[in-house]
Amino acid sequence: MSEAAMQGRVALVTGAASGIGAAVVATLRAEGATVATLDQVASSGGAASAVADLRSPEAVGAAVAQLRQHVGSFDVLVHCAGICPSGSTLEHDDALWMDVYSVNVLGALRMLRAVVPDMRGRGGSIVLVSSINARFATPGLAAYAASKAALEEMARTAALELAGDNIRVNTIAPASVDTPMLQASFARAADPAAARQANVQRHPLGRLGTPQDAAELALFLASPRSGWITGAVFALDGGAGVTRR
């Protein structure tokens, strides 16, 4: 994709400190975008950065306002931030379920509320990172999966509601991407190497996804190249979704 595709555009990337978010930041910058970053820990790589807890509407609003002062109004939001606690459906108490929803669903909503006013009347692109688990059940991930399913439905509805302002909303649903979060899940297994290999074998293409795989798709959805796409969920799964149907 040519540099002109993102030249002059201002993007905000959440979850930017590592994994998919960090790859998105580097990719958008390489294609000419001005990128601001937001995470719950300090992140680098962008023209401006802020720290905020997505559980707090006030913190999110203040952080986005701070970033806007540095880079201007936002044309693009790529929302990668989220949490993924493990535990059975009945094991998690109400507080944990609500915490997952506060970060993974309401956190995304808070980001939309913060950036959509910038895009009204001039258009924009919003890319939300979901998960294959929104469609295919995995034992031990009930709260996470339910939150990602809710995120996808919220995105589809927002796509319809914002289409009149030419604000596009799309979702990426990755399978296993080799990020620090996934590596931590392998480390908790009795045999981490075996757990990793078993996970690889679930993907017909024979490997885990990389953060760069996700970043390239996010770049396409953020750019004018995808100008007639909204309300879509893109499977980024190495074929895993085909074998699990």
Annotated model-derived regions:
Residues 2, 136, 219, 230-245:
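Short C-terminal tail/terminal secondary-structure segment
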Residues 88-89, 93-98, 199:
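Substrate-binding pocket helix/loop in short-chain dehydrogenase/reductase
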Residues 90, 136-142, 164-165, 206, ...:
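Active-site loop immediately N-terminal to the catalytic Tyr-X3-Lys motif
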Residues 112, 147, 155:
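Active-site helix of classical SDR
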